[in-house]
């Protein structure tokens, strides 16, 4: 029975979540030795992962939103330990979990403890890893939030313009992207670099992405000067934004932007004028549904 042992690292704000408590108790009643630890401040996720591994745990559970899942996934991948991860999505967007088919109810999510773990990729940039997606654009107020007005205009692609509170704030700048067999340069509005498929609560920016193919999906929204001025009218007239994207699938891509690029890395901000994004194949073992849409690249 020693293998029926796991440790849940739970975001502190979820400590009083009765659904989580009931799911944990149900697992314990089924014979699992399931311990719980709470995060309180920055750095706790990494510390708790290290403590869990030192104590001999080989199954960890990440309970929280996309940022918490990223922190725990990164810490576990960096530890290079023979341990696997179960995702307990408790955020508002839960983008990676939704795309992967992970149940959003705690009891059903914990059922994945009984499903064999599969190796999946992570993305890496500037020494930081991401589980789901990096989105970026130009603007001084890039955050994880997106204007409701902008969502109405741009639909799913609005999340690319994270934090731009008014359409008038959209700005294009020159960027250059280069990877194996791929070179693109020009004025761009925004981009998405996905290990997963969606961001912003269900918007598929990288619709064909697989989490186990050793590649990152790149989606670029170009901004020729004539398009920047008329984008709102084009979209309001019924032109779908998806066919405006330039897409690629690469093991790595280097981005150069003279004005600097604001990146949202699974909720974490990052900025730079030269950034290299790399796929880390098989960096993490995760218990996903056997029919997960994100699996298939390594089959």
From Swiss-Prot:
Enzyme Commission designation: 2.7.1.-
Keyword match Cell inner membrane: no
Domain of life: Bacteria
Positions of Mg(2+) binding: 210, 213, 215
Positions annotated to bind ATP: 39, 65-71, 92
Keyword terms, alphabetized: ATP-binding, Cytoplasm, Kinase, Lipid biosynthesis, Lipid metabolism, Magnesium, Metal-binding, Nucleotide-binding, Phospholipid biosynthesis, Phospholipid metabolism, Transferase
Entry keyword annotation includes Lipid metabolism: yes
Primary localization class, coarse: cytoplasm
GO biological process: phospholipid biosynthetic process
Entry-linked PROSITE patterns: DAGK
GO cellular component, one term: cytoplasm
Molecular function via GO: ATP binding; lipid kinase activity; magnesium ion binding
Enzyme class: transferase
Cystine pairings recorded for this chain: none
Required cofactor names: Mg(2+); Ca(2+)
Pfam assignment, any one: YegS_C
Active site, per annotation: 268 (proton acceptor)
Cell compartment(s), UniProt: Cytoplasm
Cofactor note (record): Binds 1 Mg(2+) ion per subunit. Ca(2+) may be able to substitute.
Role according to the record: Probably phosphorylates lipids; the in vivo substrate is unknown.
NCBIfam families: lip_kinase_YegS (TIGR03702), PRK13054.1 (NF009602), YegS/Rv2252/BmrU family lipid kinase (TIGR00147)
Similarity section: Belongs to the diacylglycerol/lipid kinase family. YegS lipid kinase subfamily.
UniProt-recorded name of the protein: Probable lipid kinase YegS-like
Organism: Pseudomonas fluorescens (strain ATCC BAA-477 / NRRL B-23932 / Pf-5)
